Amino acid sequence: MSKRFTLSGAILALALATVSTGPASAADLSMQANDGFQDIHFLSPDGKIQRGKRCAVPNPGADEVAAVKKQVDAWIAENGIIPDANINIPVRFHVVYKVSRGVTTGNIPQSWITNQISVLNAAYAGTGFSFTLASTDRTQNNTWFTGCYTTSREKQMKQALTIDPAHNLNIYTCSPSGGILGWAYFPNSYAESSYWHGVVLLYNSLPGGSAAPYNLGDTATHEVGHYLGLYHTFQGGCTSPGDSVSDTPYEASAAFGCPAGRDTCSSAGQDPIYNFMDYTDDACMYQFTSGQVSRMQTMVATYKPSL
C-alpha cells in the first residue's frame, strides 16, 4: 500500500485581501476551474469512477499568485533562508457517515485511516513533513454526508467538528456531490486558525476503498499538497510562472491515467505525470520535486507558522 517516493533533482491582511472571505459555491468552483476539473462520475456510491472531477480546488488567479509570491519572497528576504523545518503534523480525522433504511454508508474502518496516515508519511518522506493520527471521531449526519460539497453544509460540518486548525490538520471524509474526490484551501486563503482549513475527501478514496483508480490514498496526498501551498502542476498551462515551482516542467492541461512520455508544452521537460499534484491515477503518482518541498516549507512558514 505504501510506496517509495523520491524527490527530484504573511501577513494576514494581505492574505485576506487577495482571496474571498468564504469559499465559492460548488457552481462557482466549477466555473473558476478553467483547466477542467476532471469529469468523473460514479456508477454507484461504491462503484468505479467513470467520469467527473478529480479535485475541487480551483486554480488561483494571476493576482493571487503574484500576491503570494510577493509575501513568500518577503519572508525569505526577512529571514535570510529558505526554511528546512521538520514538522510533525497532528491529524484529526472526522468520519461523517449516513444511515438510511438501516444501511450505513461511509463509516469507514479504522484500518483505512491508519493506512491513510502511512500513505501520507511515505509520500512526504524527505519533505520535512510527517503526520501522526491524533484523534478520530465519527458523526452520523445524512445531510453533511451527501452535502459536504455545498458551502453551507461544509461550513456547518467544519464549525461543528474542527479541532484547533492552527495546530492540527483536520481531515473530513464524506460523499461529495458530483463525483468530487476531494479539496482543500491554500494556506493564504484564511487566517491559520480558520475552521475552513483542512482536507475533505471522498470516503472510499482512502486505502481499502473502492474508488479505483483513485483508492490507494493519494487523493489525500494531493489535497494535503494544496493545504501546504502547492498548486496543480498544470497551473497556468505552458505560460510562466506555471505552478510557481521552477523544477516542475510546464504542462498544458491535467493528465489522466498514466500517459508516459506525454509532452504538451514546447519548453524543456516532459509533463510531470508522476507528480502528486497532477491528476493521474494513484498508482502512477509517486513524487514531489525539491522545488515543491521548498515551496511547501516557505508557504507554511509564511502562512501557517503555528503548525
Residue locations for each model-derived region?
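Propeptide-to-catalytic entry region of secreted or membrane-anchored zinc metalloproteases
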Residues: 27-168, 174-177
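Sequence contexts marking disulfide-bonded cysteines in secreted/extracellular proteins
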Residues: 52-61, 147-149, 237-239, 257-259, ...
